[in-house]
Amino acid sequence: AALLAVAMVCAMAIPAWAAPATNGSITVKNTVDGKTYKIYKILDLETNGTGDDASSYTAFKYKATTKWKSFVDSSTYLEPDADGYVTWKAATENAADIEAFSKAAMKFAANLASDATQVADNSGSVTFTGLELGYYLITSDVDTSSKALCMLSTTKPSATVQEKNGAPTVEKKVEYASGSWGEGNDGNVGDTVNF
């Protein structure tokens, strides 16, 4: 009875709290039916901030995965510290360098097995679930230059990426003398032609 009482007192002293997310998901929207989508985990989430800094991207600490360690160690854009925690090099935190980093990562990924692969159906999206938290590269075979980077953390364990695939279509029309629009028109030198 005394042991039960001690256990009850200890249990009452433990505050209720929600455990942080340990798994995440990545959804790719605007997918093309029959095309292959792959994800590669570049960095593992090792620790994260607490309190007021928990929602800041600087609160999270990442280390290179085993497959990506050589890429990260030789990267122009990332810098591992003595403990292996990775940060962006200060001079490379701009859109152009992040784009260049993702291109270099995509080239490196060509020689690796992906962490997950899905073939899109006609639903217009694919979702990768049960992912360990970290920093991911997403590629597709819609366009060989198609890639995206996303971070899954304890405060944002899910990410949605909108794929930009294909070139925009342009419909060309020319105005007829009658004011209607069509595919062609006759004109003389000096005539005004609206198109």
Tell me what each language-model feature is.
Residues A1-F195:
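Solvent-exposed loop/turn and edge beta-strand elements of beta-rich ligand-binding domains
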